Design a protein with these regions (language model features):
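Macrodomain-like recognition of ADP-ribose-binding/processing modules
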Residues: 1-236
Length: 236
């Protein structure tokens, strides 16, 4: 039996949903906020299927979630980040296929592959959501990429993640350039994914909506709040 209480404060660009499943609490908070300004212990970082971190010529854009992460935490030490990613993939026994891009030989991994990086007492889940060409530009974009990313992410957190406060962007929107991944659609998908979970994998889910998207009028907060309230009520 699932009980839920929904509350939302539109004027502060905040929507929150608190629910309970048996004896477990489920909290979903949706905010207009930059991901790394969210107070959390774990974060989701969408990445390319090469797990490349190169920022030369914006292979990884500084304006992307991954780029912002790298500048904030590994600005002068991307080699260490590469090592941590490769080490975790190897620990999972995941072996990529041989490929090449403008930087040379590289391993390619299936969409939905997750590498967990621990850094400064926080956990970062890199999830492959897009194939890219030799210059790092997304190719073969499909909404199926979003589904694959969610499946891989939720499985990874359940298997080797941490049950804590998890902050995530709207995966598939923005730099991923997946046409069908509209803000409204991905918000709904994210809410549904976590409300439908049978297993508790986090104490709190913080879904971060880009302040730029909000400023550009791409976000309908009232519509989002109504859907969140509906899902919470539906699960009572």
């Amino acid at each position: 039996m699932v009980g839920a209480i929904a509350s939302f404060i539109i004027n502060h660009e905040k929507i929150s949903c608190r629910g309970s499943k048996d004896d477990d609490d489920l909290i979903i908070s949706i905010k207009v906020k930059s991901l790394f300004n969210a107070s959390a212990t774990s974060y989701v970082i969408p990445t390319n299927s090469y797990f490349r971190t190169k920022m030369d010529d914006e292979y990884v854009s500084p304006n992307s979630v991954q780029g912002a992460f790298q500048i904030k935490f590994f600005k002068n030490n991307l080699d260490e980040l590469d090592r941590l990613i490769s080490e975790n993939l190897a620990q999972q026994g995941i072996v990529g296929t041989d490929s090449q891009d403008r930087f040379g030989n590289v391993k390619k991994y299936p969409l939905g592959t997750v590498a967990k990086v621990n850094h400064k007492n926080k956990h970062f889940y890199f999830v492959a959501i897009n194939d890219v060409n030799q210059y790092g530009k997304p190719i073969n974009q499909s909404y199926n990429n979003v589904s694959a990313a969610f499946n891989g992410l939720l499985t990874a957190i359940k298997q080797f993640g941490h049950c804590d406060d998890l902050a995530m962007p709207l995966i598939g929107t923005g730099r991923a350039a997946i046409r069908d991944a509209t803000i409204d659609k991905v918000v709904r998908e994210t809410i549904d994914q976590f409300i439908n979970l049978e297993d508790k994998i986090a104490r709190k889910i913080i879904i971060c909506i880009s302040p730029k998207d909000y400023a550009d009028g791409k976000v309908k907060m009232k519509k989002i709040s109504n859907y969140l309230e509906y899902r919470c009520e539906f699960e009572k």
